[in-house]
């Protein structure tokens, strides 16, 4: 491989390594955001309800608890995905290269073995080594970005669930089912609306799970 191509590969490796550092920084921000949303929701959502928890109607309390629990669980999944994105990529390359610290340990039993390989390496094979390194770094980078994308989607779903945990109880409260003269009609209307919201929420989760399965393939 000629000198120009080797220099191009070196620049590409530096660029990929820079993206890896940026991905880790982005993951830290996502983790902070997800943790902040979870803490805020756990401590303050009940304060936004029309009544205290012990005075809420059964329907309001159940809807609040349901969406709150769903939101917390999905938020935790988002945190788990973010932690996976932060985790160091320690998979060795399919083809050994002398630059990756993972490959150095994986393919060499001692420093002497590694030293001998360095001595035998000539410039003509340097490009192959850099290509192997850049490919392995790119695989790790893509894996981090995929986990970040999934974490963001899960975080959005959890925030939507937290929002519904406030909106639905207020909805029940405003209609005041227990006092209205058209109780059966309102109950039926609320049941239909709640069912639609639940179906939309469930479909969102199913689509996301299908997306994960397709992504893994």
UniProtKB/Swiss-Prot annotation:
Offer one example of a GO biological process linked to this entry: defense response to virus
List the transmembrane segments. 29-49, 60-80, 152-172, 187-207
**In which broad location class does this protein mainly occur, judging by the first location in its UniProt entry?**
membrane
**GO MF term (any one):** nucleotide binding
- Membrane topology type, per the record? Multi-pass membrane protein
Instruction: Quote the cellular component terms of the Gene Ontology held in the record.
Output: plasma membrane
Cellular compartment(s)? Cell inner membrane
Q: Where is the signal peptide?
A: none
Entry keywords, A to Z? Antiviral defense, Cell inner membrane, Cell membrane, Membrane, Nucleotide-binding, Transmembrane, Transmembrane helix
In the UniProt record, does the keyword Transport occur?
no
Function noted in UniProt: Pycsar (pyrimidine cyclase system for antiphage resistance) provides immunity against bacteriophage. The pyrimidine cyclase (PycC) synthesizes cyclic nucleotides in response to infection; these serve as specific second messenger signals. The signals activate the adjacent effector, leading to bacterial cell death and abortive phage infection. A clade E Pycsar system.
What is the name of this protein? Pycsar effector protein Ec303145PycTM
């Amino acid at each position: 491989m000629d000198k120009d191509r080797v220099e191009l590969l070196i620049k590409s490796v530096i660029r990929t390594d820079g993206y890896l550092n940026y991905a880790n920084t982005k993951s830290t921000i996502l983790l902070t955001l997800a943790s902040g949303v979870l803490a805020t929701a756990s401590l303050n959502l009940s304060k936004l309800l029309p009544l205290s928890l012990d005075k809420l109607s059964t329907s309001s309390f159940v809807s609040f608890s349901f969406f709150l629990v769903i939101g917390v669980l999905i938020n935790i999944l988002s945190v788990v995905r973010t932690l996976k994105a932060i985790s160091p990529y320690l998979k060795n390359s399919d083809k050994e290269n002398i630059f990756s610290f993972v490959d150095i340990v994986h393919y060499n039993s001692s420093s002497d073995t590694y030293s001998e390989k360095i001595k035998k390496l000539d410039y003509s094979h340097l490009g192959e080594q850099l290509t192997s390194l850049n490919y392995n770094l790119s695989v790790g980078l893509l894996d981090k970005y995929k986990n970040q994308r999934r974490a963001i989607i899960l975080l959005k779903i959890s925030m939507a669930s937290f929002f519904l945990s406030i909106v639905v109880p207020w909805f029940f409260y405003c209609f005041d089912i227990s006092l209205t003269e058209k109780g059966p009609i309102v109950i039926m209307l609320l049941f239909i609306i709640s069912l639609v919201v639940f179906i939309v929420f469930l479909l969102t989760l199913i689509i996301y799970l299908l997306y994960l399965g397709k992504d893994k393939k």
